[in-house]
């Protein structure tokens, strides 16, 4: 049994390779097959193209023509995070859910945020600087507002990665605690059966949370993109 309640977040190894690597490689391999290159799209690729053109537009209803070329990237990030989130829920946590690790969520969110902001400053430098001073700000408060807006700007990637990792970590801890309770109380049906029912309901809820967190992450990326383009 795991010695520590946080032990589940330390990746297991297979042939000296962390299971996180296998999890990400498995999920990334799906992205290779959903983009047709020079050959006719397969049935699965056709389904993916339909998802990207219809479902993505329904999720991001305010997509502007300027951000439309980024739909493929946003959809790819959504599918990647969704697959990793869902795989990390299945016991015995063989895939060790990389998205519950802050280092990976920051590694995924920070480059996207940085690229979007660099593009925004490149395309409209003066417009981006004007966002540091809200309209109608008194002259005496302009230096303070510049500092506040700058700090809020650099807090975006921190919140982006922390929100995803914190929500998934909380869900994994609850599942771990309930599964441990079921194991320890398995000799008493009067206690273990209600806990098992709660565990199943929580597991279904966590699948929904995994989907919602993938949506929230990509929705924020889309929001930052709209602010800069």
Curated annotation (Swiss-Prot):
Its main location: mitochondrion. CDD domains: ATP-synt_Fo_a_6. The keyword Transport applies. The chain crosses the membrane at residues 14-34, 70-90, 105-125, 140-160, 164-184, 189-209. One of its GO terms (biological process) is proton motive force-driven ATP synthesis. One of its GO terms (cellular component) is proton-transporting ATP synthase complex. The keyword RNA-binding does not apply. It comes from the Eukaryota. It is found in: Mitochondrion inner membrane. InterPro entries: ATP_synth_F0_asu, ATP_synth_F0_asu_AS, ATP_synth_F0_asu_bact/mt, F0_ATP_A_sf. Keywords: ATP synthesis, CF(0), Hydrogen ion transport, Ion transport, Membrane, Mitochondrion, Mitochondrion inner membrane, Transmembrane, Transmembrane helix, Transport. Belongs to the ATPase A chain family. F-type ATPases have 2 components, CF(1) - the catalytic core - and CF(0) - the membrane proton channel. CF(1) has five subunits: alpha(3), beta(3), gamma(1), delta(1), epsilon(1). CF(0) has three main subunits: a, b and c. This is ATP synthase subunit a.
């Amino acid at each position: 049994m795991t010695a520590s309640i946080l032990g589940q977040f330390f990746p297991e190894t297979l042939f000296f390779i962390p299971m996180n690597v296998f999890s990400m490689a498995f999920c990334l391999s799906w992205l290779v097959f959903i983009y047709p290159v020079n050959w006719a799209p397969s049935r699965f690729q056709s389904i993916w193209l339909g998802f990207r053109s219809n479902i993505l537009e329904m999720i991001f209803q305010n997509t502007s023509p300027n951000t439309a070329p980024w739909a493929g990237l946003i959809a790819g990030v959504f599918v990647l995070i969704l697959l990793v989130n869902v795989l990390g829920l299945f016991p015995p946590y063989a895939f060790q859910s990389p998205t519950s690790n802050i280092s990976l969520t920051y590694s995924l969110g920070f480059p996207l945020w940085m690229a979007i902001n660099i593009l925004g400053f490149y395309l409209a430098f003066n417009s981006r600087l004007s966002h540091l001073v809200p309209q109608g700000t008194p002259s005496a408060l302009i230096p303070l507002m510049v500092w506040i807006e700058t700090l809020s700007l650099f807090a975006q990637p921190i919140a982006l990665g922390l929100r995803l990792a914190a929500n998934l970590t909380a869900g994994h801890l609850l599942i771990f605690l309930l599964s441990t309770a079921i194991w320890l109380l398995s000799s008493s049906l009067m206690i273990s059966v209600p806990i098992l029912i709660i565990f199943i309901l929580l597991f279904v809820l966590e699948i929904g949370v995994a989907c919602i967190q993938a949506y929230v992450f990509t929705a924020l990326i889309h929001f930052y993109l709209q602010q800069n383009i």
